[in-house]
């Protein structure tokens, strides 16, 4: 009887370990999809001010462009 209980406990532990490994693999896969990869870095947005805008720019501000990438914006 004691042998049966030990075998049952071992089988239960093996099943729980396999289930935990599968969950960890899914969590790792989801985390990898959420992180920005090298292919995401090529996507950027650029904004320029039209020449006929209502407010005139000073001479030093003419030709400036805003270049944004994933939360970081730079003036060019």
Swiss-Prot record:
Biased composition (Low complexity): 30-44
Post-translational modification: Forms a cyclic peptide with subunit A (BTD-7). An additional intersubunit disulfide bond is formed.
Propeptide stretches in the record: 23-64, 74-76
GO CC entries: extracellular matrix; extracellular space
InterPro entries for the chain: Alpha-defensin, Alpha-defensin_N
Keywords: Antibiotic, Antimicrobial, Defensin, Disulfide bond, Fungicide, Signal
Region (Disordered): 25-47
Crosslink (Cyclopeptide (Cys-Arg) (interchain with R-65 in subunit A)) position: 73
Annotated GO biological process: antibacterial humoral response; antimicrobial humoral immune response mediated by antimicrobial peptide; cellular response to lipopolysaccharide; defense response to fungus; defense response to Gram-negative bacterium; defense response to Gram-positive bacterium; disruption of plasma membrane integrity in another organism; innate immune response in mucosa
UniProt crosslink position (Cyclopeptide (Arg-Cys) (interchain with C-73 in subunit A)): 65
Signal peptide stretch: 1-22
Subunit structure, as described in the record: BTD-7 is a cyclic heterodimer composed of subunits A and D; disulfide-linked.
Function: BTD-7 has antimicrobial activity against the Gram-negative bacterium E.coli ML35, the Gram-positive bacterium S.aureus 502a, and the fungus C.albicans 16820.
Membership in a protein family: Belongs to the alpha-defensin family. Theta subfamily.
Protein name: Theta defensin subunit D
Encoding gene (name): BTDD
């Amino acid at each position: 009887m004691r042998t049966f209980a030990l075998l049952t406990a071992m089988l239960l532990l093996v099943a729980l370990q396999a289930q935990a490994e599968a969950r960890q693999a899914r969590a790792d896969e989801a985390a990898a999809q959420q992180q920005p990869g090298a292919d995401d870095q090529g996507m950027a947005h650029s904004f320029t001010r039209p020449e006929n805008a209502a407010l005139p720019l000073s001479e030093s501000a003419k030709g400036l462009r805003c270049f944004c990438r994933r939360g970081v914006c730079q003036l060019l």
